[in-house]
Amino acid sequence: MYTVKQIKELIEKHSQDESYIHELVKDDKRKSAQKLIEKWHKEREKQQQLHAAWHEMLQFENNAKAQGYTCIAGIDEAGRGPLAGPVVAAAVILKDDTVLLGLNDSKQLSEKKRLAYYDLIQKEALDIGIGIVDAATIDEINIYEASRLAMVRAVEQLAHTPDYLLIDAMTLPLPIHQENIIKGDAKSASIAAGACIAKVTRDQMMEEYGRQYPEYQFEKHKGYGTKEHLAAIQTHGAAPIHRLSFAPVKSVIS
């Protein structure tokens, strides 16, 4: 009879071979051995659920491919709501065999997971484009148009020319077939990847602004209107990266 340690090692080695694992412990009555099997079953079920969820996240990409499109980009932005800093968009073209289990709406991910997916997407994606629109331009053309402009710039930064765009609740002035999806970052793998890249890119920019303007602590709130942020504006006035057209900033500095 194998020791529990040996069983654990064999389960890890043959984790995909269900019949082997059941045969391994079918006559083993030890609680410790049975617990290992229970753990394996739970992990296997979790992996199956993650694979099913990933397949579901590819439905829009697969539908586009079924219509004959071959280069599909998912686009999303980060930073529409903050009082300071740019709005950042990312366009991501995934390879056909890319698998990013667990990727979902980037706002629901912990910072640690988001950074891990960011690194994975950078490594696994066929192409990534980033578009940035600064606070002064946001004040000039409004945040909706600035978000659209950031998305257009992101597409223009791609080395590959997409023939189909999946966009989170937006239509872009581009001569490319496009589909806009409400809450797309929770429904489309490509959009979710774009959302993750945009969010991390913007967060990194805000951390740098935090070093440039330490009195505002941008690295903590990323430009959102927290109580501490509003108090800092009240004390120090607006920084060069504040959106002066946004009501909370306007009311504090007027």
Swiss-Prot record:
Manganese or magnesium. Binds 1 divalent metal ion per monomer in the absence of substrate. May bind a second metal ion after substrate binding. It comes from the Bacteria. Its cofactor is Mn(2+); Mg(2+). GO terms for molecular function: manganese ion binding; RNA binding; RNA-DNA hybrid ribonuclease activity. Its EC number is 3.1.26.4. It catalyses: Endonucleolytic cleavage to 5'-phosphomonoester. It is found in: Cytoplasm. One of its GO terms (biological process) is DNA replication, removal of RNA primer. Its main location: cytoplasm. One of its GO terms (cellular component) is cytoplasm. The keyword Zinc does not apply. InterPro entries: RNase_HII (IPR022898), RNase_HII/HIII (IPR001352), RNase_HII/HIII_dom (IPR024567), RNaseH-like_sf (IPR012337), RNaseH_sf (IPR036397). Pfam families: RNase_HII. Keywords: Cytoplasm, Endonuclease, Hydrolase, Manganese, Metal-binding, Nuclease. HAMAP family: RNase_HII_B. Belongs to the RNase HII family. Endonuclease that specifically degrades the RNA of RNA-DNA hybrids. This is Ribonuclease HII. It comes from Bacillus pumilus (strain SAFR-032). The lineage of its organism: Bacteria, Bacillati, Bacillota, Bacilli, Bacillales. The gene is rnhB.
